[in-house]
UniProtKB/Swiss-Prot annotation:
Belongs to the peptidase S49 family. This is Protein LicA homolog. It holds the Pfam family Choline_kinase. The gene is licA. Gene3D superfamilies: 3.90.1200.10. The lineage of its organism: Bacteria, Bacillati, Mycoplasmatota, Mycoplasmoidales, Metamycoplasmataceae. Signal peptide: none annotated. InterPro entries: Kinase-like_dom_sf. It comes from the Bacteria.
Length: 249
């Protein structure tokens, strides 16, 4: 019997099937999601096993564990997440290839314009953000949606879930997305990045922190009813851009 989950996402409908002990996602499409072959994820031991993936639905094994939040982020968990990510980025899995981030910026901007909304801080840095977007790499398999609520702890293992936005992309975006969406402090960020290794460029990571926060702001404002407040992410865009300008002086 299908039982609707309490925490439904913003796009799909999700259920628990108590007869098969499976997670069921009834797909809804937004133009960006469900692009990659989900069966590729069976190559990763930190992903729930995929049983069914078609245009209508996704069925995976049910992971019975603890959904992560900021209060649970021990050093060991941060290290595990870092190791999971370098494994993904070096996996050579062939996800759908596109500059999804640039396209999301473009579509969200058009939607916001149609809603007659203005975001002065993002307008102020419009040209610089566009330059950053043009230089995004798309040679590595990436998750693209690394919120803590998409991670489940089972004993010493951390499962990554909700892969619907996975594409080929830039490793720096994944790293920045996790750091920014999880609100890591400097110590936590260092623990995480040390576990990931040295296969990234700090200057590009910083630029992608700007892009991540700007993208979250755009996503929020592309909704007719704002799903949550955008001030934290707007303030970060301003702070990081000012810091970038000072470093160039």
């Amino acid at each position: 019997m299908l039982k609707p989950l309490t925490n439904q996402g913003f796009t799909n409908k999700v259920f628990y099937d108590d007869e098969t002990n499976r997670f069921i996602k009834i797909k809804s499409y937004d133009g960006f999601n469900h692009k990659s072959d989900a069966f590729l994820l069976n190559n990763l031991d930190f992903c729930p096993k995929i049983f069914v993936d078609n245009k209508k639905e996704l069925q995976t094994e049910w992971i019975n564990g603890i959904t992560l939040n900021e209060s649970l982020l021990t050093d060991d968990i941060l290290k595990t997440i870092g190791k999971n990510l370098i494994t993904l980025h070096n996996s050579k899995l062939k996800f759908y290839k596109e500059n999804q981030i640039a396209r999301r910026f473009n579509i969200y901007r058009k939607k916001i314009s149609s809603l007659n909304r203005k975001i002065p801080i993002l307008d102020k840095y419009y040209k610089k953000i566009n330059l950053f977007l043009r230089n995004i790499d798309n040679s590595a398999p990436v998750h693209n949606d690394l919120w803590l609520f998409n991670m489940i702890k089972v004993n010493d293992k951390i499962y990554f879930t909700d892969w619907e936005y996975a594409t080929m992309g830039d490793v720096h975006f994944d790293l920045a997305y996790f750091i920014e969406s999880s609100n890591l402090n400097e110590k936590q960020e260092k623990v995480f990045l040390d576990a990931y290794g040295d296969d990234f460029e700090p200057k590009y990571l910083f630029i992608h922190k700007i892009l991540v926060n700007a993208l979250i702001v755009l996503w929020i404002n592309a909704h007719e009813v704002l799903p949550f407040d955008d001030s934290l992410y707007l303030n970060r865009v301003e702070k990081y851009m000012e810091q970038l300008e000072k470093e160039k002086e």
